Amino acid sequence: MSLTRTERTIILSLWSKISTQADVIGTETLERLFSCYPQAKTYFPHFDLHSGSAQLRAHGSKVVAAVGDAVKSIDNVTSALSKLSELHAYVLRVDPVNFKFLSHCLLVTLASHFPADFTADAHAAWDKFLSIVSGVLTEKYR
C-alpha cells in the first residue's frame, strides 16, 4: 500500500499542527487507548496510568515522536521504524492488534483537536498512513 501525492500533502499539512501539540495529543491518545482498550494496560505495569501522569505524558510524547519519524520518512516508513518494530516484537512482545487500537485512538484524538482540518479526505489519508505504520510495526512478528 502506498500513499498518493495528495495523501502525503494532507498528512504533512496536518502534521505541522500536530507536532506543536505532540505532548497533549500523545497523552490524550494513550488515555483514550487505556479507557477503550483496558487490556493494553498490561504492557505498562510499572507506569502510573492516571490521567495526565508524568509517565503517561512522557510515553505519549514518544508515541507521537515515532509517528513524526514516520511522517518525516513518509516514503520509507520501514527504515524509520525498524528499531521500534524490533523492540515491540522481540523485547516488549506487544500483541500486534494494539497498534491498530492505538491508531484508532489517534484518529479520534486528531478529529477532536482539529475538526476543521480533519475532513473526510484527511481521515482517509491518516487512516491509510497509520495502517502503513501499524504494518511496519508488525513486520518483525512474521
Curated annotation (Swiss-Prot):
Record: residues binding heme b: 59, 88
PROSITE patterns reported for this sequence: GLOBIN
One annotated GO molecular function: oxygen carrier activity
This protein's UniProt keywords: Acetylation, Heme, Iron, Metal-binding, Oxygen transport, Phosphoprotein, Transport
A matching Pfam family: Globin
InterPro entries: Globin (IPR000971), Globin-like_sf (IPR009050), Globin/Proto (IPR012292), Hemoglobin_a-typ (IPR002338), Hemoglobin_oxygen_transport (IPR050056), Hemoglobin_zeta (IPR002340)
Record-level GO cellular component terms: blood microparticle; haptoglobin-hemoglobin complex; hemoglobin complex
PTM annotation (Phosphothreonine): residues: 29
PTM-bearing positions, type Phosphoserine: 53, 73, 82
Residues annotated as domain Globin: 2-142
Quaternary assembly: Heterotetramer of two zeta chains and beta-type chains.
Full protein name: Hemoglobin subunit zeta
Source organism: Capra hircus (Goat)
